[in-house]
Amino acid sequence: MKLIRGIHNLKKINSNSAVSIGNFDGVHLGHQKLLSNLYKIGKKNNILTVLILFEPQPLEFLNNKNSPKRLTTIQNKIKYIQSWKIDIILCIKFNESFSSLSAEKFIKNILITKLNIKFIIIGDDFRFGSKRNGNISLLKEIGYQYNFKVIEISSLLYKNKIKISSTNIRKCLLENKIELARKLLGRPFSISGRVIHGNKIGRKLGYPTANISLRKNIPLNNGVYAVKISCFFNKKFVGICNIGIKPSYFSSKKHRLLEVHLFNFNLNLYEEKIEVFLYKKIRNECFFSSKNKLKEQISKDIEIVKKYFNLI
């Protein structure tokens, strides 16, 4: 897979291509359906497959203060997409100049002139171009003129009633429906980061933790979760995590933090990049007035998590 950052780095492709376009935030089951079709069409017609992403995502640029909270960072998004064996990911910088590009110019200047498009695979709600004026009808009209085919993929529904979309997955997470979010994503929702040094309070209580500083725009409530983490060549370990500002008798932190305690684990994770997969919310974050009350609650939480994972 080749990653091209920015239109200025895109050279004209001489061979034909199949293209898909979108934010692909979360790379959920609906996105995976698009990626699967893109791969199959490329393989069947022996042409290059190209996926166009935007960074930042359009609403993050156009409406920064009220933009949707991200399900995936650009790094994780690309990591998940890699498994679909797409030939080229074109990551376009979404800025003032690009946002003012008309739908017609986007098709002609990028899809036709640069990518030599023969197929475009898009979702049934796809809009593009300045002020979102471009739609599937326009694509089909220009496709007829320039000899490329538009393949419209219908939205997936979970149990024939819930549309699988990034919006609905964010809604599930913020309503603490972690298990439903997992079903719409096709995998557990996850948070990645590098393990930082903490104040070692957990270690003093007998429950050492690996800590990750969280970005502000994660669509997740504070609380305690049943988790698995991936580290050391993607090996997975079971544990429990707290997300929040740790509001207990000794807290002085103001920034948001993820703290994960792993069961039967004694390896050093400092400076390691880990991915934390959330399976179920156990409870909300609470204030504890004493060390003993906190320790007692942690013990109860761990028992709940171990039962959830059938470890006891």
From Swiss-Prot:
Keywords: ATP-binding, FAD, Flavoprotein, FMN, Kinase, Multifunctional enzyme, Nucleotide-binding, Nucleotidyltransferase, Transferase
Gene Ontology terms for molecular function: ATP binding; FMN adenylyltransferase activity; riboflavin kinase activity
Enzyme class: transferase
CDD domains: FAD_synthetase_N (cd02064)
Protein name: Bifunctional riboflavin kinase/FMN adenylyltransferase
Family in the record: Belongs to the RibF family.
Reactions that this protein is recorded to catalyse: riboflavin + ATP = FMN + ADP + H(+); FMN + ATP + H(+) = FAD + diphosphate
Transmembrane annotation, as ranges: none
GO biological process: FAD biosynthetic process; FMN biosynthetic process; riboflavin biosynthetic process
Gene3D superfamilies for this protein: HUPs, Riboflavin kinase-like
A Pfam family assignment: Flavokinase
Keyword Protease among UniProt keywords: no
E.C. number: 2.7.1.26, 2.7.7.2
Keyword NAD attributed: no
InterPro entries per record: FAD_synthase (IPR015864), Riboflavin_kinase (IPR023468), Riboflavin_kinase_bac (IPR002606), Riboflavin_kinase_bac/euk (IPR015865), Riboflavin_kinase_dom_sf (IPR023465), Rossmann-like_a/b/a_fold (IPR014729)
Pathway in which this enzyme or protein is active: Cofactor biosynthesis; FAD biosynthesis; FAD from FMN: step 1/1; Cofactor biosynthesis; FMN biosynthesis; FMN from riboflavin (ATP route): step 1/1
Reported function: Catalyzes the phosphorylation of riboflavin to FMN followed by the adenylation of FMN to FAD.
